[in-house]
Amino acid sequence: MAYFTIIQGDATDDMRHVAKIAIMQKMINFPSGLKLVFVPNTAVRSVAIGVFVGAGVVRETPDIAGISHFIEHMVFKGTKTRSSFDIVNEIDSIGAQINAFTAKSYTCFHTVSIDTNADKCADVLSDMYFNPAFDQEELEKERRVVIEEINESEDTPDDLCLERLLCNFFKGSQLEKAILGTKKTLKEMNSDTLRAYHSRYYVANNTVVSVAGNLTEEEAVALVNKHFESKYTNIASESMDCDVAERHAHSTSVKKKKEIEQTHIAFAFPSYAYNDERGVAMQLMTIVFSMEMSSRLFQSVREKLGLCYTVYGYPSAYKNNGAFIIYTSTSPENAEKAVRAIRKEIDLLLEKGVSEQELEKGKQQLKTSLVLGQESTSAMMRTFGSHAIQTGELYDFDKRIAQIDATTSEDVLKASREIFDFSNVCASIVAKDDDVDILSIMKDAK
């Protein structure tokens, strides 16, 4: 059980109002290797269910790049007993919601409903997980849909800029591939390709079912046993551990000319892997430096200098790898000024670190975001499910809160100096005129 202490009002005020919120969570390991992560909440009437499968970009070879995401689409196109309409109609008929997403390391299918309809949601998710039809005619149609999704991404400059940045930054590792794949690889896939990948990775010891909401532990276990555990016909013997290669150090830029009004700019610096304990210091640095409207980047580059509408930075963490990303978009004539302004704020951070007041603000924001996440069963399902599929462990709120409280301004400064390595930064620009050398400006500006 975890307790969060949120202090309301001035941190120096002796009259503090303290609220404690208890979270009970549990991981159940089934004989097949399947894991259930359960987070009860009797204060709500909803139940969120997520099926997390360790199938993402990191599992794909270059010739099948994008297959994890393609399967995410195809399981909605029908099972052996349900048509694509049946799937969504059954969910809509009970007022529930169903969706899915693919990340670099995993795929997730999830629902949210009132508690009395949790069994129906689990039944639909189970059917999609175990029995996708992979009909070739439906595959041909959905292939066109995903290609249009790629076209849409390529027509969205910020998406294009960031995707090209990460593919270049992680060049040489499994993470360099785009989640959507390429038009070429998609055109070469057929039903047999999808079935082979599905049969290999949609197995018990590569799956976590995450349940959050108004169920008892006994009800959650019975639900998962009925719709998942009892349906596995054999226990997979192959280890599902995925050894993701560390990124090769390099500092390069990618450029894309596009007839657009603004210049889109992004940088990536090497940072910490998922579950690295230094990640808390990085998160606190992110809040102070680049994430919120009161952050240094926002206040300087947008509010004081008026050089852009959008500027932010955030960490992206994976197994054995991580990137800290900074993005902005501005008019061509302001591109160099914006990069210099960003570099100036980085230099100030590296020289002076964060103040105690900024650190306390960051801690309050980070703890508050964790606590408020409890109020959404969907958020809790995602937090616990994504952590379990990536680490095999239960997310420890007590530990995270203790880490936040224990982090010092010196820890944040040390993390900042480890992350902002200008000899190892990569850049991406999408613009009508890509002649500006943003990488050199970032590396050399003073």
Model segments located where?
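Aromatic (phenylalanine/tyrosine) cluster motif
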Residues: 3-4
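Short hydrophobic alpha-helical segments enriched in small aliphatic residues
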Residues: 11-18
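N- or domain-start disorder-to-order transition segments that initiate the globular core
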Residues: 21-46
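Charge-rich, well-structured scaffold segments of protease-associated domains
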Residues: 29, 40, 84-237, 244-245, ...
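Active/ligand-binding-proximal structured segments within catalytic/core domains
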Residues: 40-91, 165, 267, 277-289, ...
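His/Glu-based metal-binding/catalytic segments typifying zinc-dependent metallopeptidases
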Residues: 41, 50-52, 236-296
